[in-house]
């Protein structure tokens, strides 16, 4: 049995979100929350919120025991990119890309 939580259109680059997700993949949920709490990255707050949602989904919707939960899957997929114009010298303009992510976390119960 698995429970999942998805945060879509999050205003953080998928590349930066993956740095944080790689830290928690395969870990027990309580250990993962502890890691996220002390990780000094913007993405860690967002990932922590999604992980807490996945844990709540597991407990409330699937009657799973929190003590046996671990992070089975943690991915950051690319969302739509917002393009903005950045004025430069001599009448030129650059495109600034504001990237978004879809963050998915799946938790499963450890098999005894």
Swiss-Prot record:
Biological-process GO terms, alphabetical: translation
A GO CC annotation given for this chain: cytosolic large ribosomal subunit
Gene Ontology terms for molecular function: rRNA binding; structural constituent of ribosome
Pfam families linked: Ribosomal_L22
Subunit record text: Part of the 50S ribosomal subunit.
Role of this protein: This protein binds specifically to 23S rRNA; its binding is stimulated by other ribosomal proteins, e.g. L4, L17, and L20. It is important during the early stages of 50S assembly. It makes multiple contacts with different domains of the 23S rRNA in the assembled 50S subunit and ribosome.
Recorded family membership: Belongs to the universal ribosomal protein uL22 family.
Record-given protein name: Large ribosomal subunit protein uL22
Organism: Caldanaerobacter subterraneus subsp. tengcongensis (strain DSM 15242 / JCM 11007 / NBRC 100824 / MB4) (Thermoanaerobacter tengcongensis)
Gene: rplV
